[in-house]
Amino acid sequence: MDPWDTYNIPLDHQHRLRNRRDHRHPSFSSTLLDQIYRSIDDSSTNSSSMRKTKHQNREDTRVSANRRDDFNRSKNLKTIEPVFFKHSSSSSSDSSGFSSSESDYFYRRSKSSPAISHPKPIRTTVERFERSPQNHRPNSSNKQEHGSFLKTKSKALKIYSDLKKVKQPISPGGRLATFLNSIFTGAGNTKKLNKINTTVTSTTAAAAAASSTTTCSSASSFSRSCLSKTPSSSEKSKRSVRFCPVNVIFDEDSSKYNNKNNKVYGNNEREYESIRHTLENRVMEENRRVIEAAKELLRSYQKKNKEVIEVSVEDDEEDDDDDALSCTSSDLFELDNLSAIGIDRYREELPVYETTRLNTNRIISR
């Protein structure tokens, strides 16, 4: 065919011709692609075949191993006497509520086969028994925590009891405070008691007559009611009554009433009344003295306070006057600096302020 005739050929026919030529003479790229596809297909088939062969080999080895084990067991059964030991142990707990049993199987070697080694014991357990430690773990941890808590609690209680046993404070501040308070209170009480308080002791004779016992009891009760009165709340003076088993003691001036033979409270009512009146008078006089002494103390204290206040006020006024005079001068200096000129008398007194003019200073030095 001529090349000019090809234009008259339809397009479908031209494509068919090209495809035929391509199949007869393929290009380099097409051949490469074909080879790559073929290699992939071959590799996939090879890998699948290899997997199959491996799986078959494994199965064959397993079967052979099982056969060998069965054969060996059959030999051992012929030579060994089977002895079965079953040991069942059941354990139950309240917290988890389970029971387990385990059985141990042993094979004892017979005397007729000394060369065969003893097989290892095979232990078979139930699944519930394997779960038991997991159930016991929280209980054991709870027990440990409870034990540690009890230990710490006991230690804390011991420390608290030891602190309670200690009566005195650890620091010496409390001791010093009590010591100082006892000194000041003791000194004040002794001064007041030496000036004011007098002790009156009265007794009831044990061997007195039956008629005088009633009078003695009434006298002692009356003396209690009289002597228990306090003159005033500001003075805070206490009156004490002591009962001795021998005599009635009042003061040094009342020695004429001390009868050694306990005949003070006789059957005579006049003596009893006279004693009662003297006691009342003595108590009243002492109360008056206490009141007067307290008033004098208050007056003296007030006077001292007034004098101190007046002196302080006067000192303040003098200081204010001196400050006003010193501030009025224009030029000020201390006259202690004039000691070199010959004014030594100003050293003995407080510093005096004057002017700084030399003429006035010369006149002062003359």
UniProtKB/Swiss-Prot annotation:
The record's disulfide annotation reads: none
Key words, A-Z: Auxin signaling pathway, Cell membrane, Membrane, Transport
Quick check: keyword Transport in the entry?
yes
Q: Where is the composition biased (Basic and acidic residues)?
A: 56-73
Region of interest called Disordered, as start-end residue ranges on this chain:
42-73, 129-148
What are the GO cellular component annotations? Answer: plasma membrane
Q: Where are the transmembrane segments?
A: none
Q: Does the keyword Transport apply?
A: yes
Intracellular or extracellular location(s): Cell membrane
GO BP field: auxin transport; auxin-activated signaling pathway; positive regulation of auxin mediated signaling pathway
The cross-references to InterPro entries, in alphabetical order and at most eight, read: BG1-like
> Tell me, what does this protein do in biology?
Involved in auxin transport. Regulator of the auxin signaling pathway.
Family statement: Belongs to the BIG GRAIN 1 (BG1) plant protein family.
Query: What's this protein's name?
Result: Protein BIG GRAIN 1-like B
Upper classification of the source organism reads: Eukaryota, Viridiplantae, Streptophyta, Embryophyta, Tracheophyta
